[in-house]
Amino acid sequence: HMVLKNELLRRLLTEEMPPEELQHHMDVLGIRLAQDQLMLCLLTFTPCADGRSAYAAQDDPLFDYGVLNIVEEILHESGDGLAGSLGDGIYVLLFSHGGQVSQAKIDARTQNVLQRISFCMRNYFNRQANFCMDKSLRDIAHLREGYRYVTALKQELFYHDNTCVLRSPEEQTQSVLMGLPLETEKSFASALEDGTAYEVRLNEIFDMIETRRVDLENARMILNDLLGVLNRCLLYTSPSPRDRQKS
């Protein structure tokens, strides 16, 4: 089933398909997706700190399945959506804003979907997600143009270290934080566990929130990540009840 959906998405992005054939494939595969006001997005992962590729499917055959399962569940909870793998750690997302005329509501829904996906990728796979968004909504017959656009935009990811959302290469691109950057979280936890508290510079994290002007939801995610690290370190360093009884 997943293989057939991946193939359908590849065809939609690279060749013209008659509407009758498209509808037939969607009916057979049980795909619920409006065919207008579609947002096209590529999902990739930041390479690991040691230089290894972020693509883990070669090590875990269930990686693709897990990623797509989570992404599609989030898309369906927020409305119509479809996701597939293009191979080499590149995933394509389609979600429809059909019937919605408010740009503010379209942007809010898009941001909510990406934030949830980013959060799940970090929590379940320890992967830093990046997103390349099409510059406009399209109907299903014009996805090829959008795919060329986001594929070109993906080259810009080379210049970004943290989770980011890229929309336009013509304008200055900004990194949109999706929670605490993974490397910051790891160094924070390591310093706490080693007892080198002087290396924990909370001011740098708060300065990052201020200078990037992250919204309330993102700030909440960052603070929740900090609390999570502190909680894990407390559990790691606190003596067990048995040890306390001995003392």
Residue ranges of predicted features:
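Juxtacatalytic helix/coil linker segments
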Residues: R10-M39
